[in-house]
Amino acid sequence: MKLGEHEMKSNQSVADEIRKYMNYIYLILFAGITMWYYLYSTVLEYKYPYALYLGLRYALMAYVLVSIALVVWQKQYSTVLEPVFMVLILVSAGIVTYAVKDYGVFDFALLLVGAKNVPWKRIAYVYLCIAVVIQGIAYYASTTGIIADITMQADRGVRHSMGIIYPTDMAAHVLFIMLVYAALREKKLTFVEITMMGVVSYW
């Protein structure tokens, strides 16, 4: 084997090893930030440490920079414009964040760009686990009187928030949970599953 080919394989092996660990790092950061925003949408009294959230965001920013550098170094893009587009997403999100003073836009852009080369199933599974656990805790707390159950009068009756800050937000959370579950199944849902989803949606 030629020396040049050996070096190329060695570099590829190192890059693959780095990418594997970076996938785990991304999932940890994704989990932490998802928990922050999900808890923020509930009326649970637990206060997620803001310092921890800031640390996660800065770590995610560093991760994204390293990720883009690896994409360019290993030429892991379909066109030359792909890394440019990734940078433009971050710049645009940064401008919007500066204008509206809402870091949610920039955080979402960081998570979007950082997700490149991370298996989507792992991301979806992490989200589903976090969403189901927090939603379940919020539901239990609201139905047992531990926290307030915010209600809203609608045409078909009273709508309950089930521990979320607003009934429509709760409906959105439940919808996302069902969509992610259906996507992870990757096959036709059973009649029982469809019926349960219909009942939950109506409720």
What do the PLM-derived regions correspond to, one by one?
Residues 37-53, 72-76:
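Short, hydrophobic transmembrane alpha-helix segments
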Residues 17-37, 56-74, 81-203:
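Hydrophobic transmembrane helix bundles of membrane-integrated enzymes that assemble
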Residues 1-20:
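Short, Lys/Arg-rich, polar N-terminal cytosolic tail immediately upstream
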